[in-house]
């Protein structure tokens, strides 16, 4: 958190100079409740920089912490008076009336739904399914991301064209060049 805090202070309240918020996904691999409690203690010190919820009201910050992996129960999260974390959901969470101030993102394993690897044309049937999933998530005003999606220009183009909000990549330089060329 300290490097983000330094950047936040250098940019007068933002991580990026263009005032775009940053999502920091924390993939919990340990005991959910215990980890969440420790995180809460740590994150409180960075409150001016963070998005948080107080009495069901969202205070948007420069950094939004999203818990993924072994997450605490939604009911445990809901009942916290001042909360510095949000939940990463799954497609199975769509349609359950989970508020965006609890679960702003739906994440999915690409390989659970698609066979296309980013080479050649994406099969029409898979493109239709992809569009339907994105629309379903967007109807709840949530953002969508896939992990293990095709990590190349063709894959990025498809994801951008259908409206995927957050694109995972291990090729940061190539993706950055791709984004600024388009």
Where would I find each of the regions flagged by the language model?
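Catalytic cores of phosphodiester-bond hydrolases, prominently lipid phosphodiesterases
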Residues: 1-182
């Amino acid at each position: 958190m300290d490097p983000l805090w330094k950047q936040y202070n250098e940019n007068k309240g933002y991580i990026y100079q263009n005032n775009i918020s940053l999502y920091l996904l924390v993939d919990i691999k340990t005991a959910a409740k215990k980890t969440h409690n420790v995180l809460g203690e740590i994150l409180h010190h960075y409150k001016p920089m963070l998005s948080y919820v107080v009495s069901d009201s969202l205070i948007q910050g420069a950094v939004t912490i999203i818990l993924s992996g072994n997450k605490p129960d939604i009911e445990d999260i809901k009942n916290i008076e001042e909360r510095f974390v949000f939940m990463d959901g799954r497609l199975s969470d769509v349609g359950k009336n989970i508020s965006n101030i609890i679960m702003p993102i739906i994440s999915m394993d690409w390989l659970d739904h698609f066979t296309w690897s980013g080479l050649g044309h994406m099969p029409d049937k898979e493109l239709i399914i992809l569009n339907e999933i994105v629309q379903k998530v967007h109807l709840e005003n949530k953002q969508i991301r896939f992990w293990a999606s095709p990590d190349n220009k063709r894959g990025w183009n498809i994801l951008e064209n259908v409206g995927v909000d957050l694109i995972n990549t291990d090729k940061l330089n190539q993706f950055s060049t791709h984004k600024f060329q388009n």
